Amino acid sequence: MKKNYEVMDGNTAAAYVSYAFTEVAAIFPITPSSPMAEYVDEWAAKGKKNIFDETVEVVEMQSEGGAAGTMHGSLAAGALTTTYTASQGLLLMIPNIYKVAGELLPGVFHVSARALSVHALSIFGDHSDVMACRQIGTAMLASSNPQEVMDLGAVAHLAAIKGSVPFIHFFDGFRTSHEIQKIETWDYDVLKSMIDMDAVDTFRKKALNPERPTTRGCTENPDIYFQRREAANQYYDKLPQIVECYMKQVSEATGRNYQLFNYYGAKDAEYVIIAMGSVTEAIRETIDHLTAQGEKVGLVAVHLYRPFSAKHFLAAVPATAKTIAVLDRTKEPGANGEPLYLDVKECFYGKENAPVIVGGRYGLGSNDTTPAQILAVYENLALPEPKNQFTLGIVDDVTFTSLPQKEEVAMGGEGMFEAKFYGLGADGTVGANKNSVKIIGDNTNKHCQAYFSYDSKKSGGFTCSHLRFGDAPIRSTYLVNTPNFVACHVQAYLHMY
């Protein structure tokens, strides 16, 4: 595949790849997913063609619930349909998602995962919203950075069509959705060559049509409801192999290795972290630091979360693993553990010489997760009795769940240039830095990364732009802590920060 690189964020990557497979887009805006729908709407208005040589039909509804209802109806009518959402918006879609999954319709929900309103509202990122959907019956595919959003977004659409199961393709709100990187984009002709047109034809033949009447959405009595519900098992049993097949095709086309569960680290690792989402990038960076010192550490990065294939997961974990930490970016009060932790525990249940497994929470509401915190996890795993149900990045002086805070360690490596720009919301600092990164990324061989931290106010609030440039791909999915350059555009900040 001819390589074409562009500077874009995760939302743009999701919009770009989803547009290729979409005939109808049902949209309603919600932070931080809104740019995905905005780009699709803009491209459709300009007449951009998908892989079927059609312009996407965009339908903006009155709410997320309406968008999900539109998606259900559109899929039932035989149109490949996509939507984009997050947080409370995803929760409003759940009643319709049950129908889409129950009827085995190949829709795709691209979700920039965001915190839910609990004790307080938060517009920032974690996995609280997508974890509320894990029992519905959709497949769930996780991406860790903008490049993975581009690549695995394609896998989500391709596998949904061939497997006849809807997908939730999710990535971390703000940390991935708004992080700008220089990434490789797809040629739509390559994507077209991958799609199973026989599966597309089968889907379209099942569309509601007065010439071929069928009964759907009816009431079933106890004599058949249970048995018909179990009939869907075959689709979910086949899905991991379908996803694996498309991941292999994407890997061959791009040169990047994608598996249901990607292992990274020492071959004989004794201490292993299981995680998904953007934190896996920071963990990889930390592993490089530790293995250079001879430490036996590793990571299993989860991509296909549902269906959770125990066979593929156990094959990815080194046989030498003594202690495992499972990191969840959500909190489930009252449960014996968080979702991913319980899935991992279940996989090892009854196995001989099973490793010790502990769980921890991190990153709720976009709380920053740094290499120092990852180092604390590995140090905890090396203890004779590692702490279970721990937290990272906070000081819990009430229930004492937090691991000890460690001093930050610079992980960027040689050739990395880091900069911080302090500004005021709507003063132009963020916009100028976005343009600077795109100019440098588009006109040099440098890899680039830009992330912008700010509060919930539209304008007049604190902003800080975190920019990195380097000769190698940048995996630092956390705020800049050791900048080479600092600019302060608000004089009052000199006395505040």
Residue ranges and their predicted role:
Residues 7-13, 248-271, 402-416:
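Glycine-/acidic-rich phosphate or pyrophosphate-binding loops and their flanking alpha/beta elements
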Residues 24-60, 267, 272-303, 415-482, ...:
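Anionic-ligand anchoring segments at beta-strand to alpha-helix junctions in alpha/beta enzyme folds, i.e.
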Residues 24-27, 56-59, 74-92, 106-111, ...:
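A short, small-residue-rich loop immediately preceding and capping a beta-strand
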Residues 52-56, 167-262:
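Conformationally flexible catalytic loops at phosphate/diphosphate-handling active centers
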Residues 62-64, 119-138, 310-332, 452-490:
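A structural-propensity feature for long, helix-poor, extended segments
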Residues 123-173, 197, 346, 350-365:
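Conserved thiamine diphosphate
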Residues 172-213, 315-353, 358:
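Terminal amphipathic helices with adjacent charged low-complexity linkers/tails
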Residues 323-412:
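Peripheral docking tails and interdomain loops at the edges
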